[in-house]
From Swiss-Prot:
Changing residue 160 to A: Decreases tRNA methyltransferase activity. Abolishes tRNA methyltransferase activity. It comes from Homo sapiens. Pfam families: Methyltr_RsmB-F. The lineage of its organism: Eukaryota, Metazoa, Chordata, Craniata, Vertebrata. The PUA domain plays a role in tRNA recognition through precisely recognizing the CCA end and the D-stem region of tRNA. It is an enzyme of class 2 (transferase). It catalyses: cytidine(72) in tRNA(Thr) + S-adenosyl-L-methionine = 5-methylcytidine(72) in tRNA(Thr) + S-adenosyl-L-homocysteine + H(+); cytidine(72) in tRNA(Cys) + S-adenosyl-L-methionine = 5-methylcytidine(72) in tRNA(Cys) + S-adenosyl-L-homocysteine + H(+). The active site is at 373 (nucleophile). Changing residue 373 to A: Does not impair target RNA binding. Abolishes tRNA (cytosine-5-)-methyltransferase activity. This is tRNA (cytosine(72)-C(5))-methyltransferase NSUN6. GO terms for cellular component: cytoplasm; cytosol.
């Protein structure tokens, strides 16, 4: 059920996306009316959260069943005794799925209001509480302990510290203020704690702030799928070319039983430190993270470096993951994007530079997995078509497990090639209306089918590098 307006985009950005989703191949296959309907549905679904919260179990430190039991206890506490089921994914054995309850339509709105920024609002819809830096505006006499209605300023028009706001805002639910208005807007830079504890969110999801941090990693379903598609083996040398914050890096290491070598690169120092922190927290020793630009990761002088630091000699890695920087247009919920067409379209050249480096660094018969969390044709299927033409040594491969839909028409790929891709399309199923009664009556297989389809927008392609002749 759609309760929020469709994602707010600049008109030129919406037209740019529409051209991709109503390209000649799609219109020929579906008809103009159906293609347009699917595109409008997509825009509506992007502003809503997925119907499941997905967490990956760190199987390096604990069994899935043990962590599932601990998590059930945690959910009982958070949900005041409500019995929300936890499902283990049948194809991704280290993934647990928690259904989201909502939208809850009978929440009474309060006179006392707080306005949060769009990014904070998106996090609230995925189970987060409101932290003080995310609060943009609050009612004049708000005190600690007050019941507050929380709204998202989806267009970024509310002025910091305002006492009221009449612009476009979306109701996120009610919570209890942990701080007064005066404390929130005191100007103290160290004020980073919780501002509002959400007690009646429109979408009820668990909060994972400091919950079983050594055993669980919060990850969208397609993101957890990627490392399984890569299928790393113990003893191999793996490269995660754009690794921050380390979710996929640590997953790769866990799937290898921490045996082998996982090299993680990112060009921003603080992000690399986060990868190292996550590896340490999860007890993984096979990861080495470096602050380095992935486009320059190929060593040009062919002199072997005994230290094993970047840049690397060509054909150094058994498997490479390129989870590429992208426009992120598949993220959910996302009620507004202020980017220009130039910004949305700016990633394709960078992705190709990274792809070129990845192909050079991959051993013959090695596996390369390319993924993005966006929905654009230019960053997904068009990149696959370009790669297959640019690098005759690459062959597109079927993926296992195959959970997402096939690739989108429009880049000139054959039907067989499209079937070898995985595209997660947020418009694939109607938005669910989930309450405790419907959960009790739901069949497990129906819930799993919904979890596979109602996710963020995401794309995965798998290649093998042919043997040199």
């Amino acid at each position: 059920m759609s309760i929020f307006p469709k994602i707010s985009l600049r008109p030129e950005v919406e037209n740019y996306l529409k051209e991709g989703f109503m390209n000649k191949e799609i219109v020929t296959a579906l008809g103009k009316q159906e293609a347009e309907r699917k595109f409008e549905t997509l825009l509506k679904h992007l502003s809503h959260p997925p119907s499941f919260t997905t967490v990956r179990v760190n199987t390096h430190l604990a069994s899935v069943q043990h962590v599932k039991n601990l998590l059930l206890d945690e959910l009982q506490k958070q949900f005041n005794g409500l019995s929300v089921p936890i499902l283990q994914h049948p194809d991704l054995q280290d993934v647990l799925l928690i259904p989201v309850i909502g939208p809850r339509k009978n929440i009474k709105k309060q006179q006392c209001e707080a306005i949060v920024g769009a990014q904070c609002g998106n996090a609230v819809l995925r189970g987060a509480h409101v932290y003080a830096p995310g609060i943009v505006s609050a009612s004049q006499f708000m005190k600690a302990g007050d019941v507050i209605s929380v709204y998202s300023d989806i267009k970024g028009k509310c002025k910091k510290g305002a006492k009221e706001f009449d612009g476009t805002k979306v109701f996120l639910g009610n919570g209890i203020s942990e701080l007064s208005r005066k404390e929130i807007f005191s100007g103290l830079p160290e004020l980073k704690g919780m501002g509002i504890r959400m007690t009646e969110p429109v979408y009820l999801s668990p909060s994972f702030d400091s919950v079983l941090p050594r055993y669980l990693f919060l990850q969208n379903l397609p993101s957890a799928l990627v490392s399984h598609v890569l299928n790393p083996q113990p003893g191999e040398k793996i490269l995660d070319l754009c690794a921050a914050p380390g979710g996929k890096t640590t997953h790769i290491a866990a799937l290898m039983h921490d045996q082998g070598e996982v090299i993680a690169l990112d060009k921003i120092f603080n992000k690399v430190e986060k990868i190292k922190q996550n590896a340490l927290l999860l007890g993984l020793n096979s990861i080495r993270a470096f602050c380095f630009d992935g486009t320059k990761a190929v060593k040009l002088d062919m002199v072997e470096d005994t230290e094993g630091e970047p840049p690397f000699l060509p054909e150094s890695f058994d498997r490479i993951l390129l989870d590429a920087p992208c426009s992120g247009m598949g993220q959910r919920p996302n009620m507004a994007c202020t980017w220009s067409v130039k910004e949305v379209a700016s990633y394709q050249p960078l992705q190709r530079k990274l792809f070129t480096a990845a192909v050079q660094l991959l051993k013959p018969e090695g596996v390369l997995v390319y993924s993005t969390c966006t929905i654009t044709l230019a960053e997904n299927e068009e990149q696959v078509a370009w790669a297959l033409t640019k690098f005759p040594c690459l062959q597109l491969q079927p993926q296992e497990p195959q959970i997402g839909g096939e690739g989108m028409r429009g880049a000139g790929l054959s039907c067989e090639q499209l079937k070898q891709l995985q595209r997660f399309d947020p418009s694939a199923v109607p938005l669910p209306d989930t309450d405790m009664d419907s959960l009790r009556e739901a069949r497990r297989e129906d819930m799993l089918r919904l979890a596979n389809k109602d996710s963020i927008g995401f794309f995965i392609a798998k290649f093998v590098k042919c043997k040199s002749t």
